[in-house]
Amino acid sequence: HLTGRADYPPELAGYVESCVDFLDRLDVKVQASELLIGNRTHRYCGTADLIADLAPFPWEGTIIPASRWLLDLKTAQSGIFAETALQCVGYQRAEVFIGEQGDERPMEWLGVERCGAVHIRSDGWDLYPLDTGEDTWTYFRHLAWLFHQEEARNEWVGAAAGPFADPAAMSDPPEPTN
């Protein structure tokens, strides 16, 4: 859609049509896609699906104004889960991204104002705004900390003691230690 016609298997036609409908209805202006991001402070990296400007749209009785969004695209039948907000808050709070020329740039240069997930199905699509505020960011950082402690956790249990000799065969038993 963005660069012209593309060939795709017939079984994906519904998904392609739904994606094109999303792009058209919200007048999506892609700023970046498949964007490599990183955060050295909290030691993580990832690939954000889409940074795009979206037209205003209705949501829960209000209008979300035109904004720059970080969007995660999902096609799973199961839909969108809370973990998607954690994924996107990590992307949004990254320190850097890799530009088109392979250069490292500050994430804030992208001007992301909102995060969302687009559930693309064969019969349509839904956009879910995501909460990527301080509570979500704090939760994400706790999970990152736990992940990085995994290696240390493996050292909590020492190696098995032994081998043990038959006590009757020992001439002088070792002195007990305190």
Regions found by a protein language model. Give the residues of each.
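Short acidic/polar capping segments at secondary-structure boundaries
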Residues: 38, 75-78, 122-123
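Conserved catalytic cores of phosphodiester-cleaving nucleases, focusing on short active-site segments
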Residues: 46-58, 62-77, 87-91
